């Protein structure tokens, strides 16, 4: 099958790599976001998908907008049988969706119709879901509403950060995506409309939304921090200092909401239920470090609170 792959960030890499190595499919081009300025050095950086394509000599298309007529013309010239998509990051107009013979097959990291949107992994952890997964579905104009070809499930571990879980979903979802393309080519697979029940949404997590709310129960605080780790990163104010915080451990200790207790094994902060132990913290301009060591060095006043 002639394939044009669309994707941008690191979680899309396992799927592209698997298709490149597949004996059944030929990746004739890759579509990714344009090179962007990133990092402290403000260097122009190629996307992970663009870099992988370059390694294998695969042509790379980087339209600023997928509605660009030149992009549609180039895509049509390639005559793709199918266009798999993993976290591409651009909306595709209908004339572009109509070009591949089998359409665009999107790998979405949730069990649709649950958690449609930009942050399904973060939403599943934050909500306390025990199981999530990935869905391969036919892309259409609506947001993650297309009929589903297949799913795979993944149990959410008690210590999973969004980065941990996304890594497993990206690897296991790649196998699902390849099997769906195999089934489409063989005429052995059909898409099933999504249920109207169980629909939920997962909008992009903003930096403001990543702030820790210590007035919530300890388990909720724990899930929230893991859900926004590594990006955009959980943060809080300690006094007048804004710091990023790493995952926490729920304890049986009792402290007032936002109250801080510095101990040998870390920094304890009170929530609406019990205290949580914070192992690592990242002050402004610094690397991640031991929260206890930082607090002892900072010599926090007794009345200082996390908020």
Curated annotation (Swiss-Prot):
Top-level EC class: transferase
A GO-annotated cellular component: cytosol
InterPro entries: Fmt, Formyl_trans_C, Formyl_transf_N, Formyl_transf_N_sf, Formyl_transferase-like_C_sf, Met-tRNA-FMT_C, Met-tRNA-FMT_N
Enzyme Commission designation: 2.1.2.9
Binding site for (6S)-5,6,7,8-tetrahydrofolate: 110-113
GO molecular function term, any single one: methionyl-tRNA formyltransferase activity
Family: Belongs to the Fmt family.
This protein's name: Methionyl-tRNA formyltransferase
């Amino acid at each position: 099958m002639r394939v044009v792959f669309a994707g941008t960030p690191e979680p899309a890499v396992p799927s592209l790599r698997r298709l490149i190595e597949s004996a059944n499919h030929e990746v004739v081009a890759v579509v990714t976001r344009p090179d962007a300025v990133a990092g402290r050095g403000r260097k122009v950086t190629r996307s992970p998908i663009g870099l992988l394509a370059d390694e294998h000599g695969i042509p790379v298309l980087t339209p600023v907008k997928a509605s660009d007529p030149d992009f549609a013309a180039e895509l049509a010239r390639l005559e793709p049988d199918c266009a798999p998509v993993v976290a591409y990051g651009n909306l595709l107009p209908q004339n572009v969706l109509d070009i591949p013979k089998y359409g665009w097959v999107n790998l979405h990291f949730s069990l649709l119709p649950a958690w449609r949107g930009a942050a399904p992994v973060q939403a599943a952890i934050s909500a306390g879901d025990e199981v999530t997964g990935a869905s391969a579905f036919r892309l259409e104009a609506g947001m993650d509403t297309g009929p589903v070809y297949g799913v795979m499930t993944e149990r959410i571990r008690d210590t999973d950060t969004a980065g941990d879980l996304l890594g497993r979903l990206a690897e296991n979802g790649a196998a699902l995506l390849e099997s769906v393309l195999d089934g489409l080519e063989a005429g052995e697979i059909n898409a099933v409309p999504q249920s109207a029940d169980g629909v939920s949404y997962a909008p992009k997590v903003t930096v403001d939304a990543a702030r820790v709310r210590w007035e919530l129960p300890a388990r909720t605080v724990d899930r929230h921090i893991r859900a926004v780790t590594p990006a955009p990163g959980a943060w809080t104010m300690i006094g007048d200092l804004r710091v990023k915080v790493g995952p926490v451990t729920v304890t049986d200790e009792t402290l007032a909401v936002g109250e801080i207790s510095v101990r040998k094994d870390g920094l304890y902060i009170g929530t609406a239920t019990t205290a949580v132990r914070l192992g690592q913290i990242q002050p402004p301009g610094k690397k991640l470090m031991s929260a206890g060591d930082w607090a002892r060095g900072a010599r926090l006043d007794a009345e200082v609170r996390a908020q």
